[in-house]
Every structure is written in C-alpha cells, then in structure tokens.
Amino acid sequence: MTRILGIDPGSQRTGIGIIDIDEGGRSRHVHHAPLMLLGEGDFSQRLKRLLQGLGELIEIYRPDEVAIEKVFMGKSAASALKLGHARGAAICAVVMRDLPVHEYAAKEIKLALVGKGGADKVQVQHMVGIMLNLNGKLQPDAADALAVAITHAHVRATAQRLGVNTQQAWSRKK
C-alpha cells in the first residue's frame, strides 16, 4: 500500500487530498480538506500557517509520496508570485520530512483525469468523485488536490509497468 498526498497550493486556501493505492493499483480515498489560510494575519503569517498545517497533516497521515500542482500564470503577476511563495512553503514542509515531491501542470492533471487538457474544474471534480466513489459536491481546492494525487498514482503505475522512474514516465515533465 502506498499513500499519496496531493497538494493544490494557494495563498488563501491550499487543497489537501490523500489517497491510498493498493498493490493492484486501486485508489482509496483517505482524507481531503482545504487548509484555510485567510484570517491568519499578514501574508508571511499565512505562509507560516501553511508550513505548520501541512507539516501536521504529514505527521498525522504519513504519506509515502507527495504530488503538487505547478504554478501557472493567472490573473496577475502579483497573484502568481504569491502562489509561488505558497507552493514553496508547501514544498518546504514536504522536503523537511524527506518525502519525494512530484510536480504536475494543470493541463497534465486534466489530461490524466478527464482525457483532455482543457477540461474545466467541474469535469475534474466529477471524475474525482467517480474515481474515488465520493458522493456530493467536493470543495474545489480539495478536489484539485485529490486530482493531483490520482494523477501521480497513474504516472507511478505507468512507470512501474515500464520499469522507469516517474519523471521518465511522464515525458512532458521537467
């Protein structure tokens, strides 16, 4: 059994999604939630909350591997910079615990789950619910984090079948 933590970084909310993968490659939902950062003071305090909160979740759930969404250029350069800082804090929380980090672009995640890189958030959320047998509407950030974890599980399974590492299995990765 392998436990994968998926992270959808954000400066206001960071999505957390945890799944277990059995020896047959089947995914099982363990936990998902948004890590709320608003109301935590100034931006540096939000980063501290992210670093600490994610560290606590890692200690509780003990993932074997971590997958995180790459930064994309959104509405503004300032937003992208804040997102980059949040992503950096999340990666620090992971690597400080000697866990491997795997990175996936939003298009790669959408392609892995829906079959097309231009899928919208509703389609991704729907597929996450189906794949993990979850009922009801999923909180968007947590659903995105579960999608990152599922993507890594698929890439990992392909890598194992091919006898290569995960970076080689997903050719568009850096």
UniProtKB/Swiss-Prot annotation:
Q: How is the cofactor bound?
A: Binds 2 Mg(2+) ion per subunit.
Please name the HAMAP family in this protein's record: RuvC (MF_00034)
Q: Where in the cell is it found?
A: Cytoplasm
Q: Gene3D superfamilies attached here?
A: Ribonuclease H-like superfamily/Ribonuclease H (3.30.420.10)
What is the recorded name of this protein? Answer: Crossover junction endodeoxyribonuclease RuvC
**Biological processes per GO annotation:** DNA recombination; DNA repair
The lineage, from the top, is: Bacteria, Pseudomonadati, Pseudomonadota, Gammaproteobacteria, Lysobacterales
Say yes or no: keyword Thylakoid present.
Answer: no
**Active site located where?**
D8, E69, D141
Which parts of the sequence bind Mg(2+) 2? E69
Top-rank taxon, per record: Bacteria
Cofactor(s) recorded in Swiss-Prot or TrEMBL: Mg(2+)
Does DNA repair show up as a keyword for this record? Answer: yes
UniProt-listed Enzyme Commission number(s):
3.1.21.10
Known InterPro entries for this protein? RNaseH-like_sf, RNaseH_sf, X-over_junc_endoDNase_Mg_BS, X-over_junc_endoDNase_RuvC
